Regions:
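Structural detector for short beta-strands of small beta-barrel domains
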Residues: 1-10
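Short peripheral tails and domain-boundary helices/loops at the edges of structured domains
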Residues: 56-84
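Short solvent-exposed strand/turn elements
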Residues: 19-25, 81-84
Length: 84
């Protein structure tokens, strides 16, 4: 599935994505950062847990942990940018 990165919290290594259905989710970037807003990514983002995604432009692979999907942007923003 193709998704677009909409927001990134680099401090917490979390990224919000928008899927082809207009729903949002977020994942933790494991090991390396490098994804930016408006990057198109490809992967199985509708499964919770560990996945490998690919940056469609660069072909670079990223290990991620999908925390949630199927939510509104507002809820995703609250989760990704909340203070601990």
């Amino acid at each position: 599935m193709r998704c677009i990165i909409r927001k990134v919290n680099y401090r917490r290594s979390l990224a919000i994505f928008e899927d082809v259905f207009g729903d949002y989710g977020y994942f933790e970037m494991l090991g390396k950062d490098g994804l930016e807003e408006d990057d198109v990514i490809v992967g199985n983002l509708h499964n919770l847990g560990g996945e490998v995604i690919v940056n469609d432009r660069t072909g670079e692979k990223y290990d991620v942990f999908i925390e949630a999907f199927g939510m509104s942007l507002k809820i995703a923003m609250e989760q990704v940018f909340k203070e601990k």
